Amino acid sequence: MSGKIIDKVKVFMGFDVFEDEEVEEEETVEIEDELVPVMNSKRNKVVNIHTTTQMKVVLYEPTNFEEAPNIVDNLKNRKPVIINLENIEPDLAKKFFDFLNGAIYALDGNIQKVSSGIFILAPNNVDISGNIKEELKNKGVFPWQK
């Protein structure tokens, strides 16, 4: 028993000799990566600004309300429409205007009054800038007219 107490005191004081324990070391292996040159395969993406498609403007002078869906179909196909409502009854003209104004709103388009019964209806891909009525009043319909 006395041997155990002495061993404990030696361990406590740090005088006890331990057998060297073998510590397993992890082997580090260096792997050389082969550098392979990568070819830059990016190609320049060139987009032609000038497109060959021409925008068509559709003119309508309706005589009855059955033509209204055809006008809206042109707007859905992203074609601007000029509509002349001067030669139809005022009630029918109001009905046309209300229907087309709702279609323009639904298609996120634009409507501009040219004269008392003539309107330009443009889909969302066509911008109408300025006040056309004022420009027509100042410049005339054709540039050479004043």
Curated annotation (Swiss-Prot):
Keyword field: Cell cycle, Cell division, Cytoplasm, Septation
InterPro entries the UniProt entry points to: Cell_div_SepF, Cell_div_SepF/SepF-rel, SepF-like_sf
Major location (coarse): cytoplasm
Disulfide bond annotation, renumbered to this chain: none
Subcellular location: Cytoplasm
GO terms (BP aspect): division septum assembly; FtsZ-dependent cytokinesis
Pfam families, per the entry: SepF (PF04472)
GO terms under cellular component: cytoplasm
Subunit structure and binding partners: Homodimer. Interacts with FtsZ.
Function per UniProt: Cell division protein that is part of the divisome complex and is recruited early to the Z-ring. Probably stimulates Z-ring formation, perhaps through the cross-linking of FtsZ protofilaments. Its function overlaps with FtsA.
Family to which this protein belongs: Belongs to the SepF family.
Protein's name according to its UniProt entry: Cell division protein SepF
Organism: Alkaliphilus oremlandii (strain OhILAs)
